[in-house]
Amino acid sequence: MIWHVQNENFILDSTRIFMKAFHLLLFDGSFIFPECILIFGLILLLIIDSTSDQKDIPWLYFISSTSLVMSITTLLFRWREEPMISFSGNFQTNNFNEIFQFLILLCSTLCIPLSVEYIECTEMALTEFLLFVLTATLGGMFLCGANDLITIFVAPECFSLCSYLLSGYTKKDVRSNEATTKYLLMGGTSSSILVHGFSWLYGSSGGEIELQEIVNGLINTQMYNSPGISIALIFITVGIGFKLSPAPSHQWTPDVYEGSPTPVVAFLSVTSKVAASASATRIFDIPFYFSSNEWHLLLEILAILSMILGNLIAITQTSMKRMLAYSSIGQIGYVIIGIIVGDSNDGYASMITYMLFYISMNLGTFACIVLFGLRTGTDNIRDYAGLYTKDPFLALSLALCLLSLGGLPPLAGFFGKLYLFWCGWQAGLYLLVLIGLLTSVLSIYYYLKIIKLLMTGRNQEITPHVRNYRRSPLRSKNSIELSMIVCVIASTIPGISMNPIIAIAQDTLF
C-alpha cells in the first residue's frame, strides 16, 4: 500500500515537472530560437550519422553551415527588440547579449570551412568534429544570455567539455594528448574555483542566483562591502581568468595551441574569448556593482601582465602556433581595457569593435597556417622563409593579417586599437593605454620579423619545405582559401569606414 502511494506521488511529481518544462518551452522557446536552430542541426547530424553507412560529407557541411547561417539571420531579425527575461529568470535577451552571440556564430561559420580539407587530409572523424563545434557554439551562446549563477556555470561547462574533446581529437599525436590533459586538469580546477566564488556570492546575497536579484539581496543584507564579497570577487576573477587566458592564467594556452589540430585552435582562440568576455562583463558590472574599484584594480593588473608578458614571450617563439598563443594573451590585455572602461566612455563599444576585427585577423592568420601546414607539414616560423617566391597570394594574405594584428595603419587592427585606446584615455586609464601602445609596437617587431622571412629571396635561407611547396591556383575552390579571402578583406577594408560598426556596437547597453 505504501509503495502504491509513493508510486502515485512519483508519477504526479513527474507530470508536474514535465508540464512546467513544456509550459516554459512553449511560451519562452521563441527567446532561444537561434539556439533551437542549432539544436535541430545537431539532431539532423546525429540522424544522418546513425542511418547512413556512406557518410555524405557535403551534406554534413551543408547542414552545419546552414544551421549557423540561419541562427545568424534570426539574430539579425531580432535586433533592437525590447530586452526580455525568460525561463524563470535564467536567460536574458537584449542587444548586448545578441551581439556577442552573433560574434560566436560568425566565428563558427568561418571555422567550419577552415576544417574541410584538414579533416580530409588527416582522416579524422567528420561527424563528431562538427557535433563538437556546434555544441560548443551552443554553450557559448547560452553563456552570453545567461542571467543566473547556475546557467553561467553550466553553459561554459558545455563549451569546455567540447573544447577538451576537440583539443585531443588527433589521438595518435602525443602533443595533442598532452595538451588535452593539461587543458582538462586546469579547466576542472578553474571551474571549481569559479563555483566556489559563486557560493560566496549566493550566501552573501541571502540565497539569490539571478544577477540583478543578487544586487538587491546584497542591499537587503547589507553585505555589499563585506569581506565575503571580496573573497567571491577573487575566486570568480580567477575562474573567469582561465577562460580569458590572461597572464598569469595563461599556462595552458601555448601547449593547447601547439598540440591541438590547427582548425580547432582557430576555433578556440576566438570563441572562448568572446563568450568569456560577455560573461565577465555582465558578472563584474552587475553583481559587483558596489565593488567596482576592487575589480577595476584586479583587471588592471591582469591587463598589464598580459600585455607585457604575452608580447615579450612571443618574440622568442619558433613555432607559429605558440607565437600566436602568446600574442593572443597580449590581445586579451587590450580587450580587458574595454571591460574596465565600461559603458560610461564607450568601453564596451570599443571592446566589441576590436573583437570583431580580432576575429577576422586571427582566423585569417590561422587559415594561412592551415594551408601552409597541409602543403608542407610544418608550422616552424623558419620554414616560412621565401614563401613569397612560391605562393605570393598566401604570403601576402598572411602578411596583411599579421600587420593588422600588430595594428599598422590603414588596416582594421589599427583603427580597432585606436578606438579602444582612445576610450581608455578618455576614462583616465593613462598607464594601461601607454603600456598598450608600447606593447603594440613590440608586437609589430615580431610580426615584421615573420614578414621579412616570407619575402626573402635568398636561396640559402629558403628551407626544403618551401622549395618543395605545391602551389595551388589563385582561383581554387578550396574552402580554406575562400575563408581566408573573407578574413583578409575583413582585416583591411572595414577599418577605413568603421563608423557604422561603432554605431552598432554603441547600441548594446544592457
UniProtKB/Swiss-Prot annotation:
Q: Which reaction does it catalyse?
A: a plastoquinone + NADH + (n+1) H(+)(in) = a plastoquinol + NAD(+) + n H(+)(out); a plastoquinone + NADPH + (n+1) H(+)(in) = a plastoquinol + NADP(+) + n H(+)(out)
> How does the protein's chain sit in the membrane according to the entry?
Multi-pass membrane protein
Q: Name one GO cellular component term.
A: chloroplast thylakoid membrane
Query: Which residues fall in a coiled-coil region?
Result: none
Q: What class of enzyme is it?
A: translocase
Q: What GO terms describe the biological role, i.e. biological process, of this protein?
A: ATP synthesis coupled electron transport; photosynthesis, light reaction
Instruction: Provide the protein's localization.
Output: Plastid, Chloroplast thylakoid membrane
Q: What EC number(s) has UniProt assigned to this enzyme?
A: 7.1.1.-
Assembly, in brief, is: NDH is composed of at least 16 different subunits, 5 of which are encoded in the nucleus.
The family database entries (PANTHER family) matched by this protein are listed as: NADH DEHYDROGENASE
**What's the protein name?**
NAD(P)H-quinone oxidoreductase subunit 2, chloroplastic
Q: From which organism does this entry originate?
A: Silene latifolia (White campion)
High-level lineage: Eukaryota, Viridiplantae, Streptophyta, Embryophyta, Tracheophyta
Gene, per the UniProt record: ndhB
